[in-house]
Protein backbone atom coordinates (compact mmCIF):
# COMPACT_ATOMS: atom_id res chain seq x y z
CA UNK A 1 0.00 0.00 0.00
CA UNK A 2 1.36 3.41 -1.00
CA UNK A 3 0.62 6.42 1.17
CA UNK A 4 0.91 10.09 0.29
CA UNK A 5 2.57 11.52 3.38
CA UNK A 6 1.87 15.06 2.20
CA UNK A 7 -1.85 14.41 2.70
CA UNK A 8 -1.50 13.01 6.24
CA UNK A 9 -1.98 14.85 9.52
CA UNK A 10 -2.48 12.31 12.32
CA UNK A 11 -0.49 9.07 12.69
CA UNK A 12 -1.07 6.42 15.37
CA UNK A 13 1.65 3.90 16.33
CA UNK A 14 0.89 0.41 17.64
CA UNK A 15 3.92 -0.86 19.57
CA UNK A 16 5.34 2.64 19.96
CA UNK A 17 7.92 1.62 22.59
CA UNK A 18 9.88 -0.54 20.15
CA UNK A 19 13.28 1.00 19.43
CA UNK A 20 12.74 1.57 15.72
CA UNK A 21 9.06 2.45 15.97
CA UNK A 22 9.80 4.98 18.69
CA UNK A 23 12.45 6.60 16.49
CA UNK A 24 10.08 6.81 13.53
CA UNK A 25 7.37 8.30 15.74
CA UNK A 26 9.80 10.96 17.00
CA UNK A 27 10.97 11.66 13.46
CA UNK A 28 7.46 12.19 12.10
CA UNK A 29 6.50 14.17 15.19
CA UNK A 30 9.41 16.52 14.47
CA UNK A 31 8.21 16.79 10.86
CA UNK A 32 4.95 18.27 12.11
CA UNK A 33 2.59 15.29 12.18
CA UNK A 34 0.41 14.68 15.22
CA UNK A 35 1.63 11.42 16.73
CA UNK A 36 0.20 9.14 19.42
CA UNK A 37 0.58 5.45 20.18
CA UNK A 38 -0.03 2.43 22.36
CA UNK A 39 2.12 -0.33 23.85
CA UNK A 40 2.53 -2.45 26.99
CA UNK A 41 2.91 -0.91 30.48
CA UNK A 42 6.44 -2.32 30.96
CA UNK A 43 9.15 0.30 31.28
CA UNK A 44 11.63 0.58 28.41
CA UNK A 45 14.37 3.12 27.75
CA UNK A 46 12.16 4.45 24.95
CA UNK A 47 9.68 5.77 27.54
CA UNK A 48 12.11 8.61 28.25
CA UNK A 49 12.57 9.36 24.55
CA UNK A 50 8.82 9.54 23.94
CA UNK A 51 8.28 11.69 27.02
CA UNK A 52 11.09 14.05 26.04
CA UNK A 53 9.41 14.47 22.65
CA UNK A 54 6.06 15.09 24.36
CA UNK A 55 4.46 12.14 22.56
CA UNK A 56 1.57 10.67 24.53
CA UNK A 57 0.86 6.94 24.52
CA UNK A 58 -1.49 4.41 26.04
CA UNK A 59 -0.24 1.30 27.85
CA UNK A 60 -3.03 -1.21 27.30
CA UNK A 61 -2.18 -2.56 23.86
CA UNK A 62 -4.04 -5.87 24.22
CA UNK A 63 -7.32 -4.20 25.23
CA UNK A 64 -6.94 -0.89 23.42
CA UNK A 65 -9.73 0.36 21.16
CA UNK A 66 -9.76 3.22 18.69
CA UNK A 67 -12.88 4.41 20.51
CA UNK A 68 -10.59 5.68 23.28
CA UNK A 69 -9.12 8.30 20.93
CA UNK A 70 -10.39 11.86 20.78
CA UNK A 71 -9.55 12.34 17.11
CA UNK A 72 -9.44 10.38 13.86
CA UNK A 73 -6.17 9.14 12.39
CA UNK A 74 -5.05 9.04 8.76
CA UNK A 75 -2.55 6.19 9.17
CA UNK A 76 -1.84 3.35 11.59
CA UNK A 77 1.79 2.19 11.86
CA UNK A 78 2.43 -1.07 13.69
CA UNK A 79 5.42 -2.92 15.06
CA UNK A 80 6.12 -6.39 13.69
CA UNK A 81 6.60 -7.52 17.29
CA UNK A 82 2.82 -7.89 17.33
CA UNK A 83 0.52 -10.05 15.25
CA UNK A 84 -1.29 -7.83 12.76
CA UNK A 85 -4.41 -10.00 12.98
CA UNK A 86 -4.25 -10.47 16.75
CA UNK A 87 -4.79 -6.97 18.10
CA UNK A 88 -8.20 -5.35 18.45
CA UNK A 89 -6.89 -1.91 17.50
CA UNK A 90 -5.59 -3.16 14.14
CA UNK A 91 -8.75 -5.12 13.39
CA UNK A 92 -10.81 -2.00 14.11
CA UNK A 93 -8.60 0.10 11.84
CA UNK A 94 -9.08 -2.44 9.06
CA UNK A 95 -12.87 -2.30 9.46
CA UNK A 96 -12.75 1.51 9.31
CA UNK A 97 -10.56 1.41 6.18
CA UNK A 98 -7.77 3.35 7.88
CA UNK A 99 -4.50 2.66 6.02
CA UNK A 100 -2.25 0.28 7.99
CA UNK A 101 1.49 -0.01 7.37
CA UNK A 102 4.26 -1.78 9.23
CA UNK A 103 7.21 0.21 10.53
CA UNK A 104 9.39 -1.25 7.75
CA UNK A 105 6.88 -0.38 5.04
CA UNK A 106 6.89 3.25 6.15
CA UNK A 107 10.69 3.35 6.00
CA UNK A 108 10.46 1.89 2.50
CA UNK A 109 8.01 4.57 1.40
CA UNK A 110 10.24 7.32 2.78
CA UNK A 111 13.39 5.82 1.24
CA UNK A 112 11.96 6.16 -2.26
CA UNK A 113 11.45 9.88 -1.75
CA UNK A 114 14.98 10.68 -0.55
CA UNK A 115 18.67 10.09 -1.15
CA UNK A 116 18.68 7.14 1.21
CA UNK A 117 21.56 5.53 3.08
CA UNK A 118 20.77 2.20 4.74
CA UNK A 119 22.92 0.62 7.42
CA UNK A 120 22.56 -3.11 8.06
CA UNK A 121 24.40 -5.96 9.70
CA UNK A 122 24.07 -8.44 12.51
CA UNK A 123 26.06 -6.25 14.90
CA UNK A 124 27.09 -2.60 15.02
CA UNK A 125 24.38 -1.10 12.81
CA UNK A 126 22.98 1.15 15.54
CA UNK A 127 26.38 2.63 16.40
CA UNK A 128 27.35 3.01 12.74
CA UNK A 129 24.06 4.78 11.98
CA UNK A 130 24.63 7.09 14.94
CA UNK A 131 28.19 7.88 13.82
CA UNK A 132 27.01 8.65 10.29
CA UNK A 133 24.15 10.81 11.50
CA UNK A 134 26.43 12.78 13.84
CA UNK A 135 29.01 13.35 11.09
CA UNK A 136 26.45 14.54 8.54
CA UNK A 137 24.82 16.74 11.15
CA UNK A 138 28.02 18.34 12.43
CA UNK A 139 29.13 19.05 8.85
CA UNK A 140 25.94 21.06 8.38
CA UNK A 141 24.40 18.69 5.83
CA UNK A 142 20.99 18.76 7.59
CA UNK A 143 20.30 15.01 7.36
CA UNK A 144 17.18 13.08 8.27
CA UNK A 145 18.23 10.25 10.59
CA UNK A 146 16.44 7.32 12.22
CA UNK A 147 18.48 5.15 14.59
CA UNK A 148 17.41 2.42 16.99
CA UNK A 149 18.61 4.01 20.21
CA UNK A 150 18.95 7.30 22.05
CA UNK A 151 22.00 9.23 20.86
CA UNK A 152 23.55 11.76 23.23
CA UNK A 153 24.82 13.87 20.32
CA UNK A 154 21.21 14.10 19.10
CA UNK A 155 20.21 15.60 22.45
CA UNK A 156 19.30 12.17 23.87
CA UNK A 157 16.97 11.65 20.92
CA UNK A 158 16.82 8.81 18.39
CA UNK A 159 16.04 10.81 15.25
CA UNK A 160 16.95 13.99 13.42
CA UNK A 161 14.39 15.71 11.20
CA UNK A 162 16.56 17.67 8.80
CA UNK A 163 15.69 19.83 5.81
CA UNK A 164 17.87 18.07 3.22
CA UNK A 165 17.10 15.17 0.91
CA UNK A 166 19.46 12.88 2.88
CA UNK A 167 17.78 9.99 4.72
CA UNK A 168 20.06 7.89 6.98
CA UNK A 169 18.37 4.83 8.49
CA UNK A 170 19.25 1.76 10.53
CA UNK A 171 17.61 -1.16 8.72
CA UNK A 172 16.93 -4.59 10.21
CA UNK A 173 17.31 -8.04 8.69
CA UNK A 174 14.70 -9.71 10.91
CA UNK A 175 11.96 -11.27 8.76
CA UNK A 176 13.70 -9.54 5.82
CA UNK A 177 12.25 -6.20 6.90
CA UNK A 178 15.08 -4.32 5.21
CA UNK A 179 13.82 -5.46 1.81
CA UNK A 180 11.23 -2.68 1.93
CA UNK A 181 14.08 -0.16 1.90
CA UNK A 182 15.50 1.19 -1.38
CA UNK A 183 18.91 2.74 -0.67
CA UNK A 184 21.22 4.82 -2.83
CA UNK A 185 24.03 3.77 -0.50
CA UNK A 186 24.24 0.66 1.67
CA UNK A 187 26.66 -0.03 4.52
CA UNK A 188 27.05 -3.63 5.72
CA UNK A 189 28.87 -3.99 9.03
CA UNK A 190 29.01 -7.81 9.32
CA UNK A 191 26.83 -10.91 8.97
CA UNK A 192 26.35 -13.51 11.69
CA UNK A 193 23.72 -16.23 12.06
CA UNK A 194 20.91 -14.67 14.08
CA UNK A 195 17.09 -14.51 14.34
CA UNK A 196 16.93 -18.29 14.31
CA UNK A 197 13.15 -18.28 14.78
CA UNK A 198 12.86 -16.94 11.22
CA UNK A 199 16.05 -17.89 9.36
CA UNK A 200 16.20 -21.67 9.54
CA UNK A 201 19.89 -21.73 8.59
CA UNK A 202 22.75 -19.36 7.85
CA UNK A 203 22.24 -19.69 4.09
CA UNK A 204 18.74 -18.22 4.39
CA UNK A 205 20.16 -15.21 6.22
CA UNK A 206 22.92 -14.79 3.66
CA UNK A 207 20.37 -14.89 0.85
CA UNK A 208 18.39 -12.11 2.54
CA UNK A 209 21.45 -9.86 2.53
CA UNK A 210 22.04 -10.60 -1.15
CA UNK A 211 18.44 -9.64 -1.84
CA UNK A 212 18.97 -6.40 0.04
CA UNK A 213 22.03 -5.59 -2.04
CA UNK A 214 19.84 -6.06 -5.11
CA UNK A 215 17.56 -3.33 -3.71
CA UNK A 216 20.30 -0.76 -4.27
CA UNK A 217 19.23 1.85 -6.76
CA UNK A 218 21.05 1.99 -10.10
CA UNK A 219 24.63 3.26 -9.73
CA UNK A 220 24.29 2.78 -6.00
CA UNK A 221 27.17 2.42 -3.56
CA UNK A 222 27.86 -0.63 -1.39
CA UNK A 223 30.29 -0.39 1.54
CA UNK A 224 31.39 -3.59 3.27
CA UNK A 225 33.61 -4.49 6.21
CA UNK A 226 36.31 -6.72 4.74
CA UNK A 227 37.37 -7.90 8.21
CA UNK A 228 34.20 -10.00 8.18
CA UNK A 229 34.69 -13.27 6.29
CA UNK A 230 30.96 -13.75 5.79
CA UNK A 231 30.69 -10.41 4.02
CA UNK A 232 33.61 -11.33 1.77
CA UNK A 233 31.72 -14.46 0.77
CA UNK A 234 28.59 -12.42 0.06
CA UNK A 235 30.64 -9.96 -1.98
CA UNK A 236 31.85 -12.80 -4.21
CA UNK A 237 28.23 -13.67 -5.04
CA UNK A 238 27.08 -10.20 -6.06
CA UNK A 239 25.96 -10.11 -9.67
CA UNK A 240 25.42 -6.43 -10.39
CA UNK A 241 27.70 -4.42 -12.64
CA UNK A 242 25.80 -1.17 -12.10
CA UNK A 243 26.80 -0.65 -8.46
CA UNK A 244 30.08 0.52 -6.95
CA UNK A 245 31.55 -1.63 -4.18
CA UNK A 246 34.02 -0.31 -1.62
CA UNK A 247 35.57 -2.20 1.29
CA UNK A 248 37.24 -1.06 4.49
CA UNK A 249 38.94 -2.86 7.36
CA UNK A 250 42.01 -3.30 9.50
CA UNK A 251 43.61 -5.80 7.11
CA UNK A 252 45.08 -5.33 3.65
CA UNK A 253 42.13 -7.11 2.02
CA UNK A 254 40.27 -3.81 1.91
CA UNK A 255 40.23 -0.94 -0.58
CA UNK A 256 40.64 1.45 2.34
CA UNK A 257 42.71 0.17 5.26
CA UNK A 258 42.59 1.36 8.86
CA UNK A 259 46.13 1.69 10.21
CA UNK A 260 48.27 2.90 13.12
CA UNK A 261 45.79 1.61 15.73
CA UNK A 262 46.87 2.34 19.30
CA UNK A 263 45.11 2.83 22.65
CA UNK A 264 45.68 6.12 24.43
CA UNK A 265 43.83 6.67 27.71
CA UNK A 266 40.09 6.45 26.92
CA UNK A 267 40.67 6.73 23.17
CA UNK A 268 41.47 4.43 20.28
CA UNK A 269 43.77 6.31 17.90
CA UNK A 270 44.03 5.34 14.23
CA UNK A 271 44.51 6.61 10.68
CA UNK A 272 42.01 6.25 7.84
CA UNK A 273 41.43 7.82 4.42
CA UNK A 274 44.55 9.94 4.78
CA UNK A 275 43.38 11.39 8.08
CA UNK A 276 46.05 10.72 10.71
CA UNK A 277 45.74 10.34 14.46
CA UNK A 278 41.95 10.19 14.67
CA UNK A 279 41.12 9.88 18.39
CA UNK A 280 37.86 7.99 18.92
CA UNK A 281 36.41 8.06 22.40
CA UNK A 282 35.53 4.40 22.99
CA UNK A 283 36.66 1.38 24.98
CA UNK A 284 35.76 -1.10 22.21
CA UNK A 285 37.89 -1.95 19.17
CA UNK A 286 34.92 -2.73 16.93
CA UNK A 287 33.81 0.89 17.19
CA UNK A 288 36.85 1.76 15.06
CA UNK A 289 35.26 -0.33 12.31
CA UNK A 290 31.87 1.30 12.86
CA UNK A 291 33.31 4.82 12.74
CA UNK A 292 35.42 4.01 9.68
CA UNK A 293 32.34 2.70 7.85
CA UNK A 294 30.58 5.98 8.54
CA UNK A 295 33.64 7.99 7.57
CA UNK A 296 33.98 6.17 4.24
CA UNK A 297 30.29 6.73 3.47
CA UNK A 298 30.67 10.42 4.27
CA UNK A 299 33.76 10.70 2.08
CA UNK A 300 32.06 9.04 -0.90
CA UNK A 301 29.05 11.33 -0.50
CA UNK A 302 31.26 14.42 -0.33
CA UNK A 303 33.26 13.38 -3.38
CA UNK A 304 30.07 12.86 -5.39
CA UNK A 305 29.18 16.45 -4.54
CA UNK A 306 32.55 17.93 -5.49
CA UNK A 307 33.92 18.15 -1.96
CA UNK A 308 36.60 16.37 0.08
CA UNK A 309 36.77 14.99 3.58
CA UNK A 310 39.96 17.02 4.04
CA UNK A 311 37.81 20.15 3.87
CA UNK A 312 36.21 18.97 7.11
CA UNK A 313 39.16 17.25 8.83
CA UNK A 314 38.92 19.37 11.97
CA UNK A 315 35.18 18.70 12.37
CA UNK A 316 35.58 14.95 11.77
CA UNK A 317 38.32 14.65 14.39
CA UNK A 318 36.28 16.69 16.86
CA UNK A 319 33.28 14.38 16.37
CA UNK A 320 35.45 11.34 17.07
CA UNK A 321 37.15 12.82 20.12
CA UNK A 322 33.96 14.19 21.68
CA UNK A 323 31.75 11.18 20.93
CA UNK A 324 29.54 10.75 23.99
CA UNK A 325 27.91 7.42 23.19
CA UNK A 326 24.42 6.05 22.69
CA UNK A 327 21.92 4.45 25.00
CA UNK A 328 22.60 0.82 25.93
CA UNK A 329 25.85 0.52 23.94
CA UNK A 330 28.65 0.17 26.52
CA UNK A 331 26.93 3.05 28.23
CA UNK A 332 28.55 4.47 31.34
CA UNK A 333 25.66 4.94 33.76
CA UNK A 334 27.51 6.32 36.77
CA UNK A 335 30.46 5.94 39.13
CA UNK A 336 29.55 5.54 42.79
CA UNK A 337 31.75 4.66 45.78
CA UNK A 338 34.53 3.40 43.52
CA UNK A 339 32.23 1.19 41.41
CA UNK A 340 31.72 1.77 37.68
CA UNK A 341 28.18 1.02 36.46
CA UNK A 342 27.60 0.25 32.77
CA UNK A 343 24.84 -1.07 30.52
CA UNK A 344 25.01 -2.79 27.15
CA UNK A 345 22.48 -4.22 24.69
CA UNK A 346 24.66 -7.18 23.61
CA UNK A 347 22.48 -10.29 23.37
CA UNK A 348 24.23 -12.51 20.81
CA UNK A 349 27.33 -14.51 21.83
CA UNK A 350 29.55 -12.69 19.33
CA UNK A 351 28.46 -9.30 20.67
CA UNK A 352 28.88 -10.41 24.27
CA UNK A 353 32.38 -11.74 23.62
CA UNK A 354 33.52 -8.56 21.85
CA UNK A 355 32.06 -6.29 24.52
CA UNK A 356 33.40 -8.22 27.52
CA UNK A 357 36.89 -8.62 26.05
CA UNK A 358 36.91 -4.93 25.14
CA UNK A 359 35.91 -3.89 28.65
CA UNK A 360 38.38 -6.31 30.27
CA UNK A 361 41.17 -5.02 28.05
CA UNK A 362 40.37 -1.41 28.85
CA UNK A 363 39.66 -1.81 32.57
CA UNK A 364 42.49 -4.23 33.23
CA UNK A 365 42.42 -4.18 37.04
CA UNK A 366 38.65 -4.26 37.53
CA UNK A 367 36.58 -7.20 38.73
CA UNK A 368 33.89 -7.55 36.05
CA UNK A 369 30.48 -8.36 37.50
CA UNK A 370 28.01 -9.16 34.72
CA UNK A 371 24.25 -9.22 35.15
CA UNK A 372 22.88 -10.93 32.04
CA UNK A 373 19.33 -11.55 30.91
CA UNK A 374 19.04 -13.92 27.92
CA UNK A 375 16.71 -12.64 25.21
CA UNK A 376 14.34 -15.00 23.36
CA UNK A 377 13.96 -18.70 23.94
CA UNK A 378 14.93 -19.60 20.37
CA UNK A 379 18.22 -17.67 20.47
CA UNK A 380 19.18 -19.14 23.85
CA UNK A 381 18.45 -22.67 22.69
CA UNK A 382 20.23 -22.32 19.34
CA UNK A 383 23.42 -20.78 20.77
CA UNK A 384 23.33 -22.50 24.17
CA UNK A 385 26.94 -23.76 24.14
CA UNK A 386 28.20 -20.41 22.87
CA UNK A 387 26.43 -18.61 25.71
CA UNK A 388 28.02 -20.97 28.24
CA UNK A 389 31.44 -20.18 26.79
CA UNK A 390 31.24 -16.38 26.47
CA UNK A 391 29.44 -15.66 29.74
CA UNK A 392 32.37 -17.23 31.56
CA UNK A 393 34.52 -14.28 30.52
CA UNK A 394 33.02 -12.31 33.42
CA UNK A 395 34.56 -12.73 36.87
CA UNK A 396 31.14 -12.88 38.51
CA UNK A 397 27.92 -13.69 36.65
CA UNK A 398 24.31 -13.09 37.67
CA UNK A 399 21.68 -14.69 35.45
CA UNK A 400 17.93 -14.22 35.14
CA UNK A 401 15.09 -15.99 33.38
CA UNK A 402 14.98 -15.67 29.61
CA UNK A 403 13.17 -12.54 28.44
CA UNK A 404 10.68 -13.82 25.86
CA UNK A 405 9.72 -11.85 22.78
CA UNK A 406 6.06 -11.03 22.17
CA UNK A 407 6.06 -13.74 19.50
CA UNK A 408 7.06 -16.56 21.88
CA UNK A 409 4.84 -18.66 24.14
CA UNK A 410 7.46 -20.98 25.65
CA UNK A 411 8.00 -21.57 29.36
CA UNK A 412 11.50 -20.16 29.95
CA UNK A 413 12.13 -21.67 33.40
CA UNK A 414 13.81 -24.96 32.51
CA UNK A 415 16.14 -23.64 29.80
CA UNK A 416 17.07 -20.60 31.90
CA UNK A 417 18.08 -22.72 34.88
CA UNK A 418 19.89 -25.21 32.64
CA UNK A 419 22.04 -22.36 31.33
CA UNK A 420 22.85 -21.36 34.90
CA UNK A 421 23.79 -24.92 35.93
CA UNK A 422 26.08 -25.41 32.93
CA UNK A 423 27.94 -22.17 33.59
CA UNK A 424 28.11 -22.83 37.34
CA UNK A 425 30.09 -26.01 36.62
CA UNK A 426 32.84 -23.84 35.12
CA UNK A 427 32.57 -20.64 37.15
CA UNK A 428 31.49 -21.09 40.76
CA UNK A 429 30.87 -17.33 40.98
CA UNK A 430 27.65 -17.72 39.02
CA UNK A 431 24.28 -16.89 40.56
CA UNK A 432 20.66 -17.15 39.45
CA UNK A 433 17.70 -14.94 40.27
CA UNK A 434 14.61 -15.68 38.24
CA UNK A 435 13.25 -12.17 38.71
CA UNK A 436 15.49 -9.14 38.21
CA UNK A 437 14.37 -7.26 41.32
CA UNK A 438 15.08 -10.28 43.53
CA UNK A 439 18.80 -9.79 42.85
CA UNK A 440 19.03 -6.18 44.07
CA UNK A 441 20.07 -6.84 47.67
CA UNK A 442 22.53 -9.55 46.63
CA UNK A 443 24.21 -7.24 44.13
CA UNK A 444 24.45 -4.48 46.73
CA UNK A 445 26.20 -6.88 49.12
CA UNK A 446 28.56 -8.04 46.37
CA UNK A 447 29.88 -4.74 45.04
CA UNK A 448 33.07 -3.22 46.44
CA UNK A 449 35.27 -0.33 45.39
CA UNK A 450 37.23 -1.23 42.25
CA UNK A 451 34.43 -3.30 40.68
CA UNK A 452 32.81 -2.77 37.30
CA UNK A 453 29.15 -3.78 37.24
CA UNK A 454 27.49 -4.15 33.84
CA UNK A 455 23.95 -5.12 32.91
CA UNK A 456 23.73 -6.77 29.53
CA UNK A 457 21.07 -8.14 27.20
CA UNK A 458 17.97 -7.08 25.28
CA UNK A 459 15.65 -7.65 28.24
CA UNK A 460 14.77 -5.29 31.07
CA UNK A 461 17.53 -5.94 33.61
CA UNK A 462 18.85 -2.44 32.93
CA UNK A 463 16.31 -1.27 35.52
CA UNK A 464 18.74 -2.51 38.20
CA UNK A 465 20.67 0.74 37.89
CA UNK A 466 17.69 2.59 39.38
CA UNK A 467 18.13 0.62 42.62
CA UNK A 468 21.91 0.45 43.03
Curated annotation (Swiss-Prot):
Its EC number is 6.3.2.8. Pathway: Cell wall biogenesis; peptidoglycan biosynthesis. It catalyses: UDP-N-acetyl-alpha-D-muramate + L-alanine + ATP = UDP-N-acetyl-alpha-D-muramoyl-L-alanine + ADP + phosphate + H(+). It is an enzyme of class 6 (ligase). GO terms for cellular component: cytoplasm. ATP binds at residues 121-127. GO terms for biological process: cell division; cell wall organization; peptidoglycan biosynthetic process; regulation of cell shape. It holds the Pfam family Mur_ligase. Keywords: ATP-binding, Cell cycle, Cell division, Cell shape, Cell wall biogenesis/degradation, Cytoplasm, Ligase, Nucleotide-binding, Peptidoglycan synthesis. GO terms for molecular function: ATP binding; UDP-N-acetylmuramate-L-alanine ligase activity. It is found in: Cytoplasm. It comes from the Bacteria. Belongs to the MurCDEF family. HAMAP family: MurC. PANTHER family: UDP-N-ACETYLMURAMATE--L-ALANINE LIGASE, UDP-N-ACETYLMURAMATE--L-ALANINE LIGASE-RELATED. Cell wall formation. This is UDP-N-acetylmuramate--L-alanine ligase. The gene is murC.
Amino acid sequence: MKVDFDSLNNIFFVGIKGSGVCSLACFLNSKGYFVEGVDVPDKFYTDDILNNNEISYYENIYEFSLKELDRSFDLIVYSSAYDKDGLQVLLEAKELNIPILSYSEVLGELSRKHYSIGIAGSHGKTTTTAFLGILFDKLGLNPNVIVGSSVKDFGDNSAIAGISDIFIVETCEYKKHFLYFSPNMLILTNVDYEHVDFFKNYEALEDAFLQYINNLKKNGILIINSDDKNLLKIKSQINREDINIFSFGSRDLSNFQISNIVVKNEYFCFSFLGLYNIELRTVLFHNILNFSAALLALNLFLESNGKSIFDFEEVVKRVAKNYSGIKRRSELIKEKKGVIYMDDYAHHPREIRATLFGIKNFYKNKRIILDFMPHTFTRTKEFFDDFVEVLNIADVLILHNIYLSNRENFNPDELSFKLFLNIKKINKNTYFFKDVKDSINFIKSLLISGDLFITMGAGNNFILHDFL
